[in-house]
Amino acid sequence: MTIVAEAVDLSHTYPGGVQALKNVNLSLSKGTRVAIVGQNGSGKTTLSKHFNGLLRPTTGKILINGIDAKNKTTGELAQSVGYVFQNPNYQLFSKTVREEIEFGLKNIGLQGEELRKRLIEALEIFDLKPLANKQPLSFSSGIRKIVALASVYAMHPPILFLDEPTTGQDHPGKEKIGQLLLTMANEGHTIVVITHDMNFVAKYVERVIVMAQGEIIKDGTPREIFSDYAVMEKAHIQPPQVFSLARSLASYGIQKDVLTPLEMAENILQRGLI
């Protein structure tokens, strides 16, 4: 697979001496869906913010398409790396949803028909057409996050980071975001989700990066990660409930590393347990 972004021997120390990252090495491949997980303070967000220039390495480097990002501005990096904050209030400031989406498009040089096409596409995909002329900050936190995601999506960044995208979302909202990420990855976008939502991880990502105390402690598939109790305990994360249930039902012939309720239902039916 083509590598589109790398962290090489990356360390970051905040003012005051707190070392948030310790010699992290990570490569991201084109068209993949990745989750970065770990407890608060493990370094997830600090690592992610290096890829779009919001933070700069204390030591080490970030490569975007093989090019050192140290001399790139955040504006230049934004054309390659989109970032949706955990708190959408940090990136919403326009008077209307329409203007919010247009702002990013104008920043990357779009105008005229292409800008209009991207705007309409984003409004339709995220069901925002009825809200296009309303003030983004007047919405619930869940809808504000959708607006922020739509504004970044409209720019079609090759790499997209989403910090806690399911926070404040109901089940249909989570499903919509998940399906969008699948579509974008199939189109060649690289998707990175920073999250505590292990059900979302189980259903929508293919690779999981586990962090603890500023280091990557494991890199694997969701099944591999959830099956490693030592890593889960060190990272202070819990597998999806259905995964734990499958473990307890293994003696009845249930596959012990079931990831989703649909997989569980299929296992039960295949074994004639109901």
Kindly label every feature range from the protein language model:
Residues 1-7, 11-23, 71-73:
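A short, flexible loop at the N-terminus of ABC-type nucleotide-binding domains that lies
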Residues 52:
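Helix-to-loop junction immediately C-terminal to a conserved catalytic motif
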Residues 60-68, 77:
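Conserved ABC transporter NBD signature motif
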Residues 135-139:
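Conserved ABC ATPase signature
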Residues 213-214:
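Conserved ABC ATPase "signature" C-loop
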Residues 37-39:
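The feature captures the beta-strand-to-loop junction immediately N-terminal to the Walker
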Residues 113-131:
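Conserved ABC ATPase "signature" region
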